[in-house]
Amino acid sequence: MQGLFRDPALERHFTGHSGGITQLRFGPDGAQIATSSTDSTVILWNLNQAARCIRFASHSAPVNGVAWSPKGNLVASAGHDRTVKIWEPKLRGVSGEFVAHSKAVRSVDFDSTGHLMLTASDDKSAKIWRVARRQFVSSFAQQNNWVRSAKFSPNGKLVATASDDKSVRIYDVDSGECVRTFTEERAAPRQLAWHPWGNMLAVALGCNRIKIFDVSGSQLLQLYVVHSAPVNDVAFHPSGHFLLSGSDDRTIRILDLLEGRPIYTLTGHTDAVNAVAFSRDGDKFATGGSDRQLLVWQSNLHTYDASQFEAKSALASSSCESSGVSSKQSEGSSTSKSNDLSIRIDPRQSLAYQLSEENFQVLDSKHSTQPEKVLGHGMDFKQHSSSPRFF
């Protein structure tokens, strides 16, 4: 590893939404990113510079969440209009709609097979749906307030929910029973992420903290206070060794979970960072914020070496002290160091940030027919047979 250690670096900079980005997800092949926005649209961004991007604008209210099916043939979006739209990227149109909840839908997720879909809502429930058969399967409704996020575990046997009642609950998919409850005292959880092994859960909290729990043992494993404002999103690196976070303080942090410490502080957003995600191979990560920007980064975490980082961060800290700048202090878990020796990276002067996207073009894809709502049903799914219109 000697000599190969490289810091994360900005690769691409996209703007195109007219409202803040609320969530983002890489496609399974890593060539596309789906973003949802308060401007009521979803955009599929192509990382191939010569390829066009597609904007879907079928929601009638802000879009709160987005997810890819495991095969990449479907994209689901969760709207404040109480619906979940199912998009087929190859057809560039809406293939169906779930009228899934009685209030705003906050998040959407697919299980590892792609057969089941999970939704979370302000109606205090999370629901599982069978995608192909368009059937409601089950509901988890023990929350006493909005459910901001719901995620399948990697093996699909458990569901985790984050609610404004200041709880994180773990449900057994087969039985529907709540098997674990983690209660917060300071603030409600805003987002959560399963560890790739399925045995741990990271929780982003409104009290500026990040917690990592052992799901089976109900134990708090690590606590990080590395942000100065509420934490909006967290994502595990596929290796499980690193955690990415985004906050209202406009920064992105990368944590080394093996050493229990923050290692990078990334700036570049000019407003709250609402969404973070790694690509499936971990080579890239993306961040999106209220400033409407989508930043795509080379993670370079495969080159990370703890000993080289220690030397580099110590040198940076020494330089700061010699220039009269004190190192920032941060609370951490029982395994983390008190001094935040993370390396700060600001990409706003980089070529990748300043370059205009000469080949960038967004195609608007709208469908002329509004799906019908069937009263008395928990769900309505209407297929559209005609071709979408392009503007």
UniProtKB/Swiss-Prot annotation:
InterPro entries the UniProt entry points to = G-protein_beta_WD-40_rep (IPR020472), WD40/YVTN_repeat-like_dom_sf (IPR015943), WD40_repeat_CS (IPR019775), WD40_repeat_dom_sf (IPR036322), WD40_rpt (IPR001680), WDR55_POC1 (IPR050505)
- Keywords, ordered alphabetically: Repeat, WD repeat
* Extent of the WD repeats: 16-55, 58-97, 100-139, 142-183, 185-223, 226-265, 268-307
Signal peptide feature range: none
* Record field: compositional bias (Low complexity): 321-338
Q: Where is this region: Disordered?
A: 321-341, 363-391
**Pfam families in the cross-refs:** WD40
Query: Out of the domains of life, which is the source?
Result: Eukaryota
Statement: the UniProt record of this protein carries the keyword Repeat: yes
> What are its GO biological-process terms?
centrosome cycle; cilium assembly
Which cellular component terms (GO) are annotated to the entry? centriole; ciliary basal body
The answer to whether the entry has keyword Repeat is yes
Q: Which family does it belong to?
A: Belongs to the WD repeat POC1 family.
Q: Which PANTHER family match?
A: POC1 CENTRIOLAR PROTEIN HOMOLOG, WD REPEAT-CONTAINING PROTEIN 55
Job of this protein: Plays an important role in centriole formation.
What this protein is called in its record is POC1 centriolar protein homolog
